[in-house]
């Protein structure tokens, strides 16, 4: 993959107006790139961690996440987490668009030892289920502390 192709690909995704892989293929071909097909675009989307999210016009488009590395407890994740709340059964975490699965993966890796039975993530919302042996208020405080300390 050439540096020019990579740069053009990233610039296209930053425009947040391409909803399908075929649209990206066509746009790159119009810029003069040859040998571009859907499977190559699919590999590039995976390689660069692209996600589908809603743009300002509420259209589903491909874009690059701000944070491309795999999250860990020392990553600056606080800016991806917008709100943490709970009811008697679940903790709900609201994130920036496209960040929920990354945050959920981090929480799943922390796991049962910290009181997390499992997570379910959408695009910008995570449901966290506590283990039975951990009070929900205590788990909520642990999760909030995790994101406060990651700046």
From Swiss-Prot:
Assembly description: Homohexamer.
Family membership noted in the UniProt record: Belongs to the ArgR family.
Superkingdom field: Bacteria
Official protein name in the record: Arginine repressor
One family name in Pfam for this protein: Arg_repressor
Gene that this polypeptide is encoded by: argR
Cross-referenced InterPro entries: Arg_repress, Arg_repress_C, Arg_repress_C_sf, Arg_repress_DNA-bd, WH-like_DNA-bd_sf, WH_DNA-bd_sf
Transmembrane residue ranges: none
Keywords of this entry: Amino-acid biosynthesis, Arginine biosynthesis, Cytoplasm, DNA-binding, Repressor, Transcription, Transcription regulation
GO MF annotation terms: arginine binding; cis-regulatory region sequence-specific DNA binding; DNA-binding transcription factor activity
Cellular location(s): Cytoplasm
Pathway(s) per entry: Amino-acid biosynthesis; L-arginine biosynthesis [regulation]
Main location: cytoplasm
Keyword hit for Cytoplasm: yes
Cellular component terms (Gene Ontology): cytoplasm; transcription regulator complex
GO terms classed as biological process: L-arginine biosynthetic process; protein complex oligomerization; regulation of arginine biosynthetic process; regulation of arginine metabolic process
Role description: Regulates arginine biosynthesis genes.
